[in-house]
Amino acid sequence: MVAIGFDVGGTNVRGVALERGSPVPLATRRSKTETDGDVLVDTIVEVAEGLIDDLRATDDSVVLEAVGLGIAALMDANGIFRYAPNIPGVFDYPLVERVKGRLGVPVIADNDATTATWAEAKYGAGIGHDHMAFVALGTGIGTGFVLGGRLHRGAHGYAGESGHITIERGGPEHITGARGPWEYFASGNGLGILAREWAAAGRLDSAIALAGSVEAILGEHINELVDANNPEVEPLITEFADSVAIGMANLVYILDPEIIVLGGGLVGLGEMLRSAVEASLAGRILGRDHRPAVPVVLAKLGSRAGAIGAGALAFDATR
């Protein structure tokens, strides 16, 4: 018996086939994300059936037990795909019901940050911690929480949209129309904005040399500079880490986690980012000399965490 976990983002639909209790994919497949609900269902079904076919090529006894969907969207507790800024054209769509009707097995769905949170809690950097916050720094910011050993989803399934917490009242306008949200400053896009500001001020010439111009500088160029141990980049990462820590401090005050797991594409910045975030966070906590420190650790499961967690949650739902 296998489950298939999906990570459905704005660009790709990634599927992994898993055995119960294991984070190691038996097979993987990927396809393009479509912006029509019915076509998206077709894509998910095609990937799922392809994975089962791949497994049956060597073992014809393989049976699909359940499917888990981790989606970069507002997914409500009834499996309705409500809204996703990166998947335009799909609103209030009964995604779980439609996929279940096509595949004939139990189907669950959650936000992709929530499923990645569960993967890290169950198999990764959060093992052994009943109170954990997961912060994924990518194009935006996704978060998820384990409280008392269980995922915290909130009343309607929408808990974890922390990237939209207001950090600066009346601050710069985000693509969502909100002003001064955390992810404007502390995401991959935020790192690019900060790097361009530094370069324009003559503080990051090495990034200009890589990108060709100030305007062309992106977060990926900063990754290259970190990998090359370029001395110009460490002060930039320290300032960026402070923006990350501001939002994390809010989570610490509200949730009191034992540990914060740092995931998403920006974990490629590695120890330089992690240590700077942890130091900045420690300095922002009231009464820090009289309470346990909250360690910040790097996620362990990489880009497949969302799909692995979705598969694990699908198995959990069939117990």
Model-derived regions: residue spans:
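A charged helix-plus-loop insertion that forms the helical arch/lid used to bind
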Residues: I80-F91
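ATP-binding/phosphotransfer module of carbohydrate and carboxylate kinases, centering on a glycine-rich
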Residues: M1-A66, M75-I80, E97-V105, K122-H129, ...
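Residue-level detector of high-confidence beta-strand sites
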Residues: L26-T28, A84, G154
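General beta-strand structural signal in soluble alpha/beta enzymes
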Residues: V107-N111
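A short acidic/small-residue loop/turn micro-motif
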Residues: S31-E34, G89, A159-E161, I167
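Glycine-rich phosphate-binding loop of actin/hexokinase-like ATP-binding domains
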Residues: I127-N189
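Short alpha-helical segments enriched in small residues
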Residues: T114
